[in-house]
Amino acid sequence: IGGIPAANAKCASHAGMTPAPHSSHPQAWGPLLQPPTVKTEPMDDGNFSKEQTSGFYSEGFHSASPSSSSKDSNGHSPRSSGSTREPSPFYDAMPLKAKANLGMHLDSFRNSLPYSLLTPPGFESRASDARDHSPSYESYSPRTLAPPAHVSHPLGRSDATPPKSPPRTPSSPERRSFDRFHDSGFDGVDHNKHDGDDGREGSGLEDDFDEEPGLRVPAVNSHGKVKTFKCKQCEFVAVTKLSFWEHSKEHIKPEKMLCCRKCPFVTEYKHHLEYHMRNHMGSKPFQCSQCSYSCVNKSMLNSHLKSHSNVYQYRCADCNYATKYCDSLKLHLRKYQHNPAMVLNLDGTPNPLPIIDVYGTRRGPKQKPLSKIFEQQTGTNNHSP
């Protein structure tokens, strides 16, 4: 009887039959007979590995998406056959821990701001106070299970009001100069009234330009000639006010430039801007006593009063040219290279004091010092026989 198994084994070996796997290799079937282990979410804060706490951008993002480059999809997925790790379910707790870790980073970034993003300018109450005193989802959210992240220290008070936004357009030097002009007590401008009559704030400059066609169209004087505007600092000559004002900006420093709000008028003198603003408002306080003429300053009134006089104060010494205005005499002297004669008073008597500055920019004649007149008189008396 004892020889029968040996004979059977010998016959099986001669027949080419393979032995049973459980008899020859018992270690290959051992893991299959054991009950599968199920991975559960740990509740202790100290049981997290370094790989699980690496942050949202390392493993948490890949674990949330079943991509081919993810570690969880390669190592923990039951579909991978070459993995040497312990098998675990496909949907584990890594996405929750990654989101919790991301929330902690966002809280640290929010606490590092010097002001609250939810607090509007001028409103000092914190919008997050109600959140601190009210029941929050943080008490039961998965972020409480995540390991503590690095929290930076805040730079300042978290309830500080954020700084106000800068104006849409930076304040230009000419705008600051014009504001100083209005703050100086000029009583001719209504600050509460908009510049435009159509209710629009500011009322674009182009609309105001069209109200005065003389700005863009050349004007004709009483003699039928085109009126020109000559620059006093160079040889530039313009035929319109607009082109002349644009050229004047080249000779005025930005910190001294004064601009009109209703037109492109520019100047560096405060009283010139005041006279110009009176023209816009229709305010002409200087009235002529002999006609209905009115103007914005006394200099213009004095020039107008000469039109009612029969005395030609300014004359040429080389010809019979005579005029009532000093500027007209200067143009004549420059053109023909003549010399001026003695200036007359309004009553027609000679006046030795005024000096005609032919090539100067001064409006009107200069006044000769009395000491020079006395020296001239004494010199003529000494040379006389």
UniProtKB/Swiss-Prot annotation:
Feature: compositional bias, Polar residues: 374-385
A GO cellular component annotation in the UniProt record: nucleus
Gene Ontology terms describing biological process: segmentation
Source domain of life: Eukaryota
Biased composition, class Basic and acidic residues, residue ranges: 126-135, 173-203
Location, primary (coarse class): nucleus
MF GO annotations: DNA binding; zinc ion binding
Gene3D superfamilies assigned: Classic Zinc Finger
Positions of the UniProt region annotated as Disordered: 1-94, 124-216, 361-385
Residue intervals of every C2H2-type zinc finger in the record: 229-251, 258-280, 286-308, 314-338
Compartments where located: Nucleus
One protein family per Pfam: zf-C2H2
Keywords: Developmental protein, DNA-binding, Gap protein, Metal-binding, Nucleus, Repeat, Zinc, Zinc-finger
Compositional bias annotation for Low complexity: 63-77
Function field: Gap class segmentation protein that controls development of head structures.
Family stated for the protein in its record: Belongs to the hunchback C2H2-type zinc-finger protein family.
Protein name: Protein hunchback
Organism: Bombyx mori
Classification of source organism: Eukaryota, Metazoa, Ecdysozoa, Arthropoda, Hexapoda
